[in-house]
């Protein structure tokens, strides 16, 4: 998922044309870089304020590339485990809430209830030391899971959306922040043009 933000220089064209070509390019590139970094922070904050997931690494998942004409923010990431969102095991049904403005919803499909447990193979051990344990220690993979049928085996972990999908949401994240990004770009462009003009005085 990536978003491209272009430049509307109509409001600064008169002054912009008075700059030399090299200074025009520098001002545009500087404005785009600054705006892209501001956008990455705003997108991350908006996503964190929208979803119940903890430590999703929204900001780290976004990479910026910019030229003198446009900036691109790319987000990468796999679907997140549902256990990383708000989950309640109270009562006889596991419930989960993905949106902060949402509510806890029971996880039941075809009368089969989800559960929270270690779903790693009981014989699986770590091959080398890691922050989660020493080599040879048993692997634990805690997840919200659900059986695929009535039989005991055939278990699948439950996932929510990926980081790029959440960040790119027109309704909840990108669509909310986009007007601010456009305004920031115009403000930043004016600022760098003013700086260039001051150097030429």
Give short role names for the model-derived ranges.
Residues 3-201:
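Short, Lys/Arg-rich flexible segments
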């Amino acid at each position: 998922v990536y978003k491209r933000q272009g430049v509307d220089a109509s409001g600064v064209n008169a002054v912009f044309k008075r700059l030399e070509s090299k200074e025009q390019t520098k001002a545009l590139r500087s404005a785009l870089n600054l705006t892209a970094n501001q956008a990455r922070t705003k997108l991350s904050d908006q996503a964190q304020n929208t979803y119940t997931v903890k430590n999703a690494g929204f900001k780290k998942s976004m990479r910026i590339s910019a030229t003198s004409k446009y900036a691109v923010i790319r987000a990468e990431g796999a679907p997140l485990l549902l256990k990383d969102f708000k989950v309640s095991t109270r009562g006889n049904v596991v419930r989960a809430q993905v949106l902060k403005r949402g509510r806890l919803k029971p996880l039941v499909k075809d009368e089969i209830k989800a559960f929270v447990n270690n779903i790693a193979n009981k014989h699986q051990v770590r091959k080398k030391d890691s922050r989660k344990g020493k080599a040879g220690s048993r692997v634990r993979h805690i997840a919200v899971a659900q059986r695929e049928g009535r039989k005991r085996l055939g278990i699948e972990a439950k996932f929510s959306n990926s980081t790029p999908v959440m960040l790119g949401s027109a309704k909840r994240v990108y669509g909310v922040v986009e007007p601010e990004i456009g305004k920031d770009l115009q403000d930043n462009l004016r600022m760098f043009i003013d700086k260039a003009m001051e150097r030429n005085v």
